[in-house]
């Protein structure tokens, strides 16, 4: 058997990025083993054919049942609780990277690699995720929940490249058709509107939730909506209500099946509470003078400060304008391009009292 330190398991989707990952690592002298996780939809024929062309071992892991029972179920449950989930953030630690580690151990691979546009950096004994060089493709936001034990076995070959450079590389290597392929920006298990997906997976949802009321911030009923799971904080389009001025979703109350509407100014926040955090070094995070947080994928980093509350939650104070704080989304903390950690945005109910209790925090 070859030296395992040069044997790497690559998560192969059959797409542009995983194909380039395999080729780049081959050029660097690694022995490549490919595994394709079938989690939804058709057989991964592209990945099989690419592996055969590259002359690498290839396996298919049929994970449709556990994927549906964990990631898809969580996605549905979050909307049923009035939250806005990001399934990639859940999938990476609970499913994708966990499965890659298990397969790597089974196949004698010390390393795992994926086509994520991110980098890794070791500093002070810790491994940090660093934003990829292509700002349009950077995926560091989705990786904050990965633990140190996983990161120490990861290789992200595409972190220093732009998407166009990767396409050019594949073209040069003779993979012209692959280099010209398009790519989907959708959630991998949803084609189209997530609301249709919820109805398809939960035929009882409409009857269970039923229509509810749009209300103003004063509690005045403004009109009926189709059910709280079909809305998200900050939403303006698709509300199907005419108020004579732009209206945005401010709050969602699952218990009362109400959706509060208001103007853009009412979406602004000075603080937020976050939970279930994963921080690389807490002392560094809390003392960081240049800390910034992203509260949505592709959103601009917002300068902030963070402190730990007595109940274990994080209190985040924004130092610049922040808007549309959506429970269920991720708050990812950066110093420059380096990820210091992240957390899930919690329910903001009762935040006024939390702010009052921490009014002396500077």
Curated annotation (Swiss-Prot):
Location of this chain's protein in the cell: Cytoplasm
Annotated site, Interaction with tRNA, chain positions: 116, 329
Organism lineage: Bacteria, Pseudomonadati, Bacteroidota, Bacteroidia, Bacteroidales
Binding site for ATP: 11-18, 37, 115
Keyword presence, Endoplasmic reticulum: no
Organism, as annotated: Bacteroides fragilis (strain YCH46)
Full protein name: tRNA-specific 2-thiouridylase MnmA 3
Gene (UniProt): mnmA3
Function in brief: Catalyzes the 2-thiolation of uridine at the wobble position (U34) of tRNA, leading to the formation of s(2)U34.
Molecular function terms from GO: ATP binding; tRNA binding; tRNA-uridine 2-sulfurtransferase activity
